[in-house]
UniProtKB/Swiss-Prot annotation:
Source taxonomy: Eukaryota, Fungi, Dikarya, Ascomycota, Saccharomycotina
Family statement: Belongs to the VHR1 family.
Species whose genome carries this gene: Saccharomyces cerevisiae (strain ATCC 204508 / S288c) (Baker's yeast)
Induction of expression: By stress, probably through the induction by the transcription factor PDR1.
Sequence ranges of Polar residues compositional bias: 621-631
Domain of life: Eukaryota
Function (record text): Transcription factor that binds to the VHRE consensus sequence in promoters of VHT1 and BIO5, and regulates their biotin-dependent expression.
Other remarks in the entry: Present with 279 molecules/cell in log phase SD medium.
Name this protein carries in UniProt: Transcription factor VHR1
Region (Disordered): 118-139, 580-640
């Protein structure tokens, strides 16, 4: 295309009496003439304010879309009508440019004098008729618009939305801005200031409650006659809900309400809404808001989805913390609370800054708990909707493998419901966890009542699962020793639950599993349990090794057997031979005739020997090979 189309081309392609604007009006059902005049006046005002008439319509696609979005939002049309409003703005831009070519001297004089009133009036008188707009605009396809990245769009936006003086020469001729180093800094500053003004305007809408909460509640697609019925049927019946807003693109009003009320009462948010200059002075507040949101996301994943494999947890966390999802979170939180469409504003410059500033402001004013708990409920709802497979896995029982993460089921659902494979119960478990919860009573919903019993005495405790980690066996035993005044140090105790001996791992699983049932623990003596059991926890005192001298019913076994064909004494014979080789000297006859009966009689005469440790043998080369001339007693009883 070598140049702009001539006026003759427009007249040839024109349908007599029925232009493109008239077709678009019929398509939009825009038949109210009074309202149409208001629309035309507002359209020309925006075109002149942002100087869209200085360039061809094909060169400023992004600017036309933004002006069309403003007009569509102000006149209450849905997003589906965006293309029609873009065509109306495009037609108006071309009409204005043609009218200025016809009266170049008059427009140049008006611009030089700095008065735009006569200009607007002359434009309004010529651009509202269908004869001045070619129907080729209506038939224009999207292929006419050159694709551009976000950076290119931002650069184009910064070049087009500049003050008029930056494009005007001394003789009144308008030149496009050249992307030189000298002109880029004012352009970027002006563009960034416009973004700051948009953020300030949106915060002002939230603080002043432009859209009343009652109106937002009425428009909430989640509103139903019965919350319990909704909790069990919303996930499976989402397509049946009659609403123009997709369910998965919104957040229930009862989850957003607490944050919106805090924003209205926030002093910091009010200061931001009244900021006249740059909002860069709130840079640290943005960091506070961003870190708070990321912390809330990590808390939700660790709190409700810790039974998933680490790669899945890492993936969900990374996707939820991505700028795209955070921008979507900003739209879901504040989209219904303002008259402007947040989806048409830049994500990095407007949507994310709005989210960070508002969350940082209410965290500064009200603290972490009143802010992060409602925010965590919203994030939990979004994760449940976006990742239904993860939510179903969160309802499954944990694997018995010790390498798996401990399951943490929802606090309001008992274990028998979680083990049920019924979809209705699983959906109920999923939805009930998103119910609002007061920050000051957050721990009350996840407390666990623990009852510890020792003999005929018992003591009840309250275990806070959110703020405390699971105790170890030794910690519980040490506290119970002081609680129940256990002074007998000769007995070894263990912790039992449902007649099962607990170790540190099983005790942690018991305390980490969220349920409304009580935990009953019993302190018992474990001295009768075989020591070979590898699951026996470390007791208060180490278990005492029993010896042969403490068992009077055991027969006396000589060190050197008199009869070699006795099978019961063969095991000690090999043991004696080893001791003889260690001592490096043959044992005397009197030592070889010494039997364990001597040790048995000695232990019977001294009742305190079983309370003391058995001395280790001391090997020498004299005829008294062992201490006190006695043989050592074996540590473990032989299996005869």
């Amino acid at each position: 295309m070598n140049g702009p189309p001539t006026f003759t081309q427009y007249r040839i392609n024109k349908f007599s009496g029925n232009g493109a604007t008239h077709k678009i009006r019929e398509l939009l059902n825009f038949n109210d003439e009074k309202k149409w005049k208001q629309f035309s006046s507002r359209r020309l005002e925006l075109i002149d304010k942002f100087q869209l008439s200085q360039y061809k319509a094909s060169e400023q696609d992004q600017n036309i879309k933004q002006i069309a979005t403003i007009l569509r939002t102000e006149f209450g049309y849905p997003v589906s009508c965006s293309k029609e409003f873009e065509k109306l703005v495009t037609a108006a831009v071309q009409s204005v440019r043609r009218n200025r070519k016809r009266s170049k001297k008059r427009y140049a004089l008006s611009i030089a004098n700095g008065s735009g009133g006569n200009v607007n009036n002359s434009i309004s008188s010529n651009s509202t008729s269908d004869d001045e707009i070619s129907p080729s605009i209506y038939q224009r396809s999207n292929s006419d618009f050159l694709p551009s990245s976000n950076y290119a769009a931002d650069f184009q936006f910064s070049n087009k939305f500049q003050p008029l003086m930056s494009h005007q020469s001394h003789n009144g001729t308008i030149f496009p801005t050249v992307g030189t180093q000298n002109d880029s800094s004012p352009s970027v500053t002006s563009t960034q200031q416009k973004y700051n003004d948009i953020v300030t305007m949106l915060v002002h809408d939230l603080v002043t409650n432009v859209v009343p909460l009652s109106e937002q509640a009425l428009k909430d697609p989640y509103t139903g006659p019965n919350l319990s019925h909704f909790a069990t049927s919303s996930l499976s019946q989402q397509p049946n809900i009659t609403t123009n807003i997709p369910i998965d693109s919104t957040v229930p009003f009862f989850l957003r309400e607490k944050l919106l009320l805090q924003i209205q009462r926030s002093r910091t948010c009010q200061d931001i809404s009244q900021a006249a200059g740059s909002i860069d002075i709130y840079a640290n507040l943005e960091i506070l808001g961003e870190m708070s949101i990321r912390m809330s996301i990590a808390f939700v994943i660790e709190r409700f989805f810790s039974n998933l494999v680490s790669s899945s947890m890492k993936y969900i966390t990374a996707k939820t913390c991505s700028p795209e999802n955070l921008a979507l979170l900003s739209q879901r939180l504040f989209g219904a609370a303002t008259r402007h469409n947040l989806s048409h504003f830049p994500a990095a410059q407007v949507q994310l800054r709005l989210l960070y500033l508002v969350i940082g402001g209410i965290v500064k004013d009200f603290g972490f708990d009143p802010t992060l708990y409602p925010l965590s409920e919203i994030i939990h709802h979004i994760v449940m909707v976006q990742y239904p497979l993860a939510s179903s896995c969160a309802s499954e029982p944990p694997s018995s493998s010790p390498n798996k993460r401990v399951k943490r089921s929802p606090p309001v659902v008992s274990s028998d419901v979680m083990l049920n494979n019924n979809n209705t119960l699983s959906n109920r478990a999923t939805l009930l966890t998103t119910l609002p919860m007061k920050p000051q009573s957050a721990n009350k919903d996840v407390n666990r009542r623990v009852i510890i019993r020792f003999n005929d005495r018992e003591q009840a405790f309250t275990f806070h699962q959110l703020s405390n980690g699971p105790p170890t066996v030794s910690e519980v035993l040490e506290n119970c020793k002081n609680l129940f005044n256990i002074i007998n140090k000769n007995k070894n105790f263990g912790i039992f639950h449902n007649d099962n001996l607990l170790n540190d791992e099983s005790l942690a699983k018991l305390f980490d599993s969220f349920s409304t049932s009580e935990i009953h623990l019993v302190i018992k003596d474990i001295s009768t349990i075989p020591l070979q059991d590898a699951k026996i926890p470390v007791p208060i005192t180490l278990p005492k090794m029993s010896c042969i001298g403490e068992n009077p019913s055991m027969p006396s076994i000589p060190l050197v057997p008199q009869e070699k064909d006795d099978p019961k004494k063969s095991s000690l014979t090999a043991f004696d031979n080893i001791l003889n080789r260690i001592s490096k000297s043959p044992m005397n006859e009197e030592n070889s005739n010494t039997t364990l009966n001597t040790g048995t009689s000695t232990s019977n005469t001294n009742n305190n020997d079983h309370n003391e440790s058995v001395p280790a043998p001391y090997v020498t080369k004299n005829k008294n090979s062992f201490q006190n001339g006695n043989l050592p007693q074996p540590v473990f009883q032989p299996l005869l």
